Amino acid sequence: TVAGIVRLRVPIGYSQPKRGWVNPLREAWGLKAYQQVSPELQARVCQTATLVPSYEGVAELARLWDCEVSDDLVHRHVQEMGAKASRLGPLPAAPWGSSTEFSLVIMMDGWMARERGPDWGVSWRRKTTERIAWHEVKSAVIYRLEQAVRTGKGRGLILEKYIVATAPDTAPVDFGQAVRAEAMRRGLGRAKRVYVVMDGAVWLWHLARDRFAEAVLILDFHHAREHLQAVGQALYGEDDQRVRQWVGPLITQLQRGKEKRVVKTLEELLSKGRRLSSAQRKVLQREVGYFQEHQDHLHYQRWKRSGTPCGSGAVESLGLQLQRRLRTCGQFWKRPGLTHLLRLTVLFKNHDQNVLWN
């Protein structure tokens, strides 16, 4: 237990209906047969395992509770409870809380997890081996707009947010279903407005239009800026000063509600640019198409005035947090181990651990 080893003498009896010996107290406490770790200790080591870089680190921290556990014990219980969490059906609806009107913000993105490839264990001297495999973990952050505040020093802060993170290679359709289910738990059906913020990945936009048809879709401002930067670099190469001089005014126009002028500038540059090289023209055609497709998702001045986020920093921050645990030096995961720990991480971050430890 969290208080060390506790030995109890308890009565047991023979059950005629069960035709075996039973331990009523063990059953009343919810302990399985031969279980030697209390539910509270199990919950603590599992939660700690989602925060520190290794199972060995969990064992070291447990000693601060005067509790001697091994990293093998931690690993075993993380995998046991993570597997149980992965088998859970739809979670119960969250309490509604305040009845005042609110807006809901949904941000989606992905990051790459490092797993053991099909040739894991084969000598690195063989050049054709696939020892390491990279697969995308799709993630989302959901929060009420009114929960976004600023500190005294002006730093942005979200008071209460919820996350979705699915196993590597989860299909976009299944990820979209998971995001919508979590959004419904957090008030999607009651929200006055819904904003979906994301980068330009095609699968994200298909998902958003399919699952959140009535939402306001917003292209992450920093990704829009990166695409303008790509045009500037195609035109002026390594001349950073000329690139900044060309890109700067267009970024300012985006910020000041002149997004149509930005799109028109790019279109004119493509149509009148007779001296463009084939490589420059290829980049321009790609970026003009990009901004034409997203010209209804660029109203940054309007959204900023209403307090609506124009960037997907919250979900990118989530990706970095997960990578600090799941992609540190020397970590090469098997799929079950990664999936189980990821599932526990989501439960703890969403304060849903009571479905496993009540």
Where are these regions (language model features)?
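N-terminal juxtadomain amphipathic helix
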Residues: 1-10
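Catalytic center-proximal scaffold of phosphoryl-transfer enzymes
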Residues: 12-358
